[in-house]
Structures are given as C-alpha cells and as structure tokens.
Amino acid sequence: MVLDELISEFDRGLRSLTGISRMSRPVPVPTEPTVGELTPAERAHAAGLMRVNHVGEVCAQALYQAQKLTARSASSKAMFEEAAREEEDHLAWTAHRLKELDSRPSLLNPLWYAGALAIGVAAGTLGDKVSLGFMAETERQVESHLDGHLSELPATDTASRAIVEQMRVDEVKHGKAATDAGGIELPLPARMLMRAASKVMTRTAYYL
C-alpha cells in the first residue's frame, strides 16, 4: 500500500514537471467576450504573471504530496489529496494559458518543486495540526497574491483573469477546509519567513 502510494505520487511529480498534468475540470472561460488585442507589452506582462502562477501550482503539488505522505490521520490525507487534485487543474490551466500567450513555464521548476517538497515534509513531520495550519497560511498568502495579479492583469486579458478568478475561489476553499479541520495558526516568524520565500520565488519566476 505504501509502495503504491509512493509510485502514485512519483508519477504526479513527474507530470507536474513535464507539463502533462491531468485536467479534471475544463479551463475557465470568460463570462464576457474579449475586447481588443493585447499589446506586446501587455502580453509579456500577462505571461510573466501566469508563469508565476504556474510555479505556484508546481510548488502546491510538491507541498501537498509531501504533506499527504507524512499525515497521520486518514482524514488529513484525504484533504491533502483533494486539494492536490484541484491544484493539478490549476497547473494544467496555467500551462495552457502560457502556451496561448506564446510563453513557457519557469526554467527553474525542478528547483521550486524540490524546495517545496522538502518544506512539505518538514511541515508534515510536525504533526497534522501544524501541517494543516501551514496549508491554511499558504492558501491565505496565495489568495492575497492572486488578488494582486487580478489588479495587474490587463483588463482585456479576460482569458487569464477567468483562470485566476477560479483559482482564487479554490484557494479560499482549501484554506477554510484546513482551518476547519483543526489547523493551528502559525507563529508570526514562520508566516514572515513564508512571505519572504514567496517574494523570492515570484520575482525570479516572473523572468525565469
């Protein structure tokens, strides 16, 4: 059983890094038709933002894989699995949008993935309440990050905006579920360290 689980997660990791993630839900579509074309500068900026979002989803896969494997209770394992499945949709959606924008994922995805996997293992070994608290705080920070992207994306880029808006809905749900399941609030130094690490990742991934 443990071996089967490890093989399954290894397969998911490979799919995360090779861009062949499975999509269980279709790519969100704009509620209103796109008006006008993106300028080259707008297209480049949108691509940078969506590359950052794609990196975030690569990291989410690694985090939730590690937290699922180290979780003590069956209910916690199930929660991390459900979140990972929905985040895999996000991974596929952002990859799809990057192709539409004639861009590419981050060249450093293996590094981001490995780092997030290590962090997920560390959080998981501290117990389910801490691990769920880490999940809740991660989702809160991602929610804030997506709000920022919605304010930055060109108004005419309705395709990217539709994807980010649905991602935000899912992240809020994941964070609430983790808190409701008993996730504790992380100490301020831990939250600040998470924000600092996130800034390094987002600033680098925008270009690389």
Curated annotation (Swiss-Prot):
Keyword Cell membrane attributed: yes
GO cellular component terms attached to this protein's record: plasma membrane
Catalytic activity as recorded in UniProt: a 5-methoxy-2-methyl-3-(all-trans-polyprenyl)benzene-1,4-diol + AH2 + O2 = a 3-demethylubiquinol + A + H2O
Membrane topology value: Peripheral membrane protein
Gene name tied to this protein: coq7
Naturally occurring in which organism (per UniProt): Burkholderia ambifaria (strain MC40-6)
Subcellular location: Cell membrane
Role description: Catalyzes the hydroxylation of 2-nonaprenyl-3-methyl-6-methoxy-1,4-benzoquinol during ubiquinone biosynthesis.
Cofactor binding note from Swiss-Prot or TrEMBL: Binds 2 iron ions per subunit.
E.C. no: 1.14.99.60
Keyword annotations from UniProtKB, A to Z: Cell membrane, Iron, Membrane, Metal-binding, Monooxygenase, Oxidoreductase, Ubiquinone biosynthesis
Xref: NCBIfam families: DMQ_monoox_COQ7
Positions annotated to bind Fe cation 2: 87, 139, 171, 174
Any one GO molecular function term: 3-demethoxyubiquinol 3-hydroxylase activity
Protein name, entry field: 3-demethoxyubiquinol 3-hydroxylase
PANTHER family linked: 5-DEMETHOXYUBIQUINONE HYDROXYLASE, MITOCHONDRIAL (PTHR11237:SF4), COENZYME Q10 BIOSYNTHESIS PROTEIN 7 (PTHR11237)
